[in-house]
Each structure stands twice: as C-alpha cells, then as structure tokens.
Amino acid sequence: MTETPIRIATRQSPLALWQANYVKDALMAAHPGLQVELVTMVTRGDVILDTPLAKVGGKGLFVKELEIAMLEGRADLAVHSMKDVPVDFPDGLGLVTICEREDPRDAFVSNTYAKIEDLPSGAIVGTCSLRRQCQLKAARPDLVIKELRGNVGTRLSKLDAGEYDAIILAAAGLKRLELESRIRSFIEPEQSLPAVGQGAVGIECRVNDQRVRALLAPLNHADTADRVRCERAMNLTLQGGCQVPIGSYALLEGDTIWLRALVGEPDGSQIVRGEIRGPRTQAEQLGITLAEQLLSQGAKEILERLYCDHE
C-alpha cells in the first residue's frame, strides 16, 4: 500500500512557494520515497493590499486560511515565515519545527542611494512595517515614510516606477528569491532591530498528528529554535502584534543567549530598549523576563496607547 502523501498548505506568492518547496525538498531528502504535495491557496492578506496590515487584522491574515485547511484535514502542515506567525495558535494546531535561520537583517534597497545615511531630507521610504518605521523615524525624522504592501516583486516594481526613493525589505526574502543584487546595503541590528523570528521558516501542523511530527523532526534546527523561542516568548508576554513596533534579536554565544529587544511609538518619538543574557536552556524564561523589564520601563504605556487607538 502506498503511503499517503504529505500535503503542504501554502500561499501562492513566490516567497511562500520558495519556503514550501524548501520544506518539501528537505522532507524528501530526509525520507526517501516520501510523497509530498503543495496545496496552494489565497489568503485575505494577499487580497487586501490597499490598507495597512495593522488596520485589517495584522499578519494573521496570511495564515488563517492555511490553518483552516489543516483543521479540516485538507492539508497536513503549513510553512510560514516566522516573522508573520501570530503569538497564538488555534486549538489543535501548533508550531512544531523551526528550520535554520537565514540572514535576519533588514535590507536597504534603492536605485539611487547606497545607504540610509545618503538619503536627502524629505526622501520617500517605503515599508509596511511599524517596527521599521519606528526605528527609521527615530534615526531620520526628516524622512517621509510611505505605506508599501504587496509581495517582493510588487514592492520592487513600485520602487522602479519611481514611487519611492528607497524601500526596506527583509534580506532573507531577497536572498531566497535570488534578488540579493537589489540590496544596496544591509541594515545591522544595532541600527534596525529585526522582527521576532525574522529570517526563520517555521512549520505548523496538528499537534496530535504523530506521523507528521515524526517526519518533521529532522528539519528542526536546535540553535535557531532556541533563539526564536526566546524572541517569541518575549513577544507573547508583550502581546505583540502588527499594531505595535516591536523588534527583537537573539544571538547564541556558546550556550548563552543574548536577547535584545525594543518597543516604540510608530513615529519613533519614544523607544524603550533592553537586553538580557542567560543560559539557552532558559530561552523562553529569558524572553519573558526581558519583556517584563520593558513593560516596567515604559513599554506598558506605549502598548496601552497603541492598542486603544486600534480598538
């Protein structure tokens, strides 16, 4: 009897398909003879392109349809860019595997300027991320930030059409789509702290599906998983979402995790920063502890204001 194929739910954007095929290839390499199929679908996040994400439900718009497909048995797993995965999961589903992290940095893309510092006053910069906007406005309050939605190709086309002087994108996505040549410079974490989980690919499935969980086990990258769990524990404690500028980046130094994080106002007028070091065995607790420190240092008031504005 032929084993049932594994079905991967995925969005249809080039980057989503790259990620799904990456997991498909990894599964087939780890389990020769395994059949793996892609189940493509369109999410609300792909359709609603004329409104800022924070106003229409946040990044969860990109995963809800995939989760319904798994809960209804039409798919066995879903592949996500970890920076787009909400802090909470529906009953019966969970994040079971985190693959090795790609470059977590933001990338500066422009046809005219080599780096942020070269932009003239009043230059128009495109991003859909409040996190990037916050840090950019703090460093360069003289810049004009303009909403930028759509997949990577669409965003580059808008830049090329002259709608923006520069745009900020995730370096990982450009590298995966073999568009690294478009990157004029990388923005280091000291200048723009990445999003929670940025650059990592995560796999969600039904938590009681032991067959799928066993098949996925070889794809888990322990170092990346500890770093991302640390970042996500911080984000969960802050109840972070698309409506608030939150950045975090965890690094491993031997068996020690170094976590940096920030919470800020979208206009960059106030940013609360913090960092913590501790054993990787306590990755999640470190994230929780740093979040509590940020909350006590002014992040609580920022978050309350921002969430009130979106109610």
Swiss-Prot record:
Pfam families on file: Porphobil_deam, Porphobil_deamC
Transferase as UniProt keyword: yes
Pathway(s) annotated for this protein in UniProt: Porphyrin-containing compound metabolism; protoporphyrin-IX biosynthesis; coproporphyrinogen-III from 5-aminolevulinate: step 2/4
Transferase keyword on record: yes
InterPro entries noted in UniProt: HemC, Porphobilin_deaminase_cofac_BS, Porphobilin_deaminase_N, Porphobilinogen_deaminase_C, Porphobilinogen_deaminase_C_sf
Keyword list, A-Z: Porphyrin biosynthesis, Transferase
One GO cellular component term: cytoplasm
EC number: 2.5.1.61
Modified residues (S-(dipyrrolylmethanemethyl)cysteine): 242
GO molecular function: hydroxymethylbilane synthase activity
One example of a Gene Ontology biological process annotation: protoporphyrinogen IX biosynthetic process
Family: Belongs to the HMBS family.
Function: Tetrapolymerization of the monopyrrole PBG into the hydroxymethylbilane pre-uroporphyrinogen in several discrete steps.
HAMAP family: Porphobil_deam
Quaternary structure and interacting proteins, as annotated: Monomer.
Further comment: The porphobilinogen subunits are added to the dipyrromethane group.
Name of the molecule in the record: Porphobilinogen deaminase
Organism: Vibrio cholerae serotype O1 (strain ATCC 39315 / El Tor Inaba N16961)
Lineage of origin: Bacteria, Pseudomonadati, Pseudomonadota, Gammaproteobacteria, Vibrionales
